[in-house]
């Protein structure tokens, strides 16, 4: 029996255990950097599997090691995030969230359960591969500045140094049984923009006595789009979107100030820095030119995510070996962001997608919605494929 077949066999053997882990995690979600019970559960399972670990990274993070033969030969890390979102779950399932207003609506329960499953499989096969596999259970992916940034600062990729890191993420647009890969640039950076436009409020019938912040804010929003369309290189994907505009006046009341919130996303760090400076300068100068003022606050989020080309090609080939060519898809650029991006700026990285969609079972909702759920057939694939990719990355040069 080949190693791939042995991994598939173990994934099938442990499938119900992996599902049970996922359902426990789903029923007991915790918000970013508050994953205390989740961390305790992961530690309990690692102890049960006989895998040594160190806890306490960024509060709740865990790093474990599985040493094969010749453990110093090569080190590959696998990452799973553990936090949930502040969403009220609307799924009617036995494992529905017990924590009101908190839900695993982004699939991090799947990621953690898959990594635990991969860990169990790899530990049982550690005499069959050379090198070391590092397991990174990470908190706080959903909250800036991102748990990955803290894990890196606290040495999660060191001692021994990881030459590569792999991560997977659920994708409800991809049918269960299939996975997706993309080599090179994949996901965008993400920065939050907060504008407070100040003027002088008053009666709507006497605009000459006021400095209208609603009008100023409207001009600012339109003008800022010119930064993307006329300053940005059209070959660099960029998005500037504003989703919150608060002007607490009335039909005949001009307010004193307007608050605007939005996001800027791109895939080039130099352009990112330049664009943010231009956004600040244009908002401030336009407000001043119209008689008001604009306070600009920019919260820097995650950098862009780039999949190492050769590593990603290797992983795609390995996925074809494991699942068949018909079940491995090529992904397009994705303007969402992920704090796995921090790892991609530290070492060779491959971030791929795990299909979870099954229309017959009603598993069709997108992530970050109250009805998001998966076809749990994906868990056996998620755990087994991650184990296989780790082994192939150890085995092959790229």
PLM features: what roles do these ranges have?
Residues 24-28, 104, 108-111, 168-169, ...:
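Histidine-centered active-site/metal-ligand motif
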Residues 2-5, 69, 391-398:
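Generic C-terminal helix-cap and adjacent flexible tail
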Residues 215-398:
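Metal-dependent amide/peptide-bond hydrolase catalytic core
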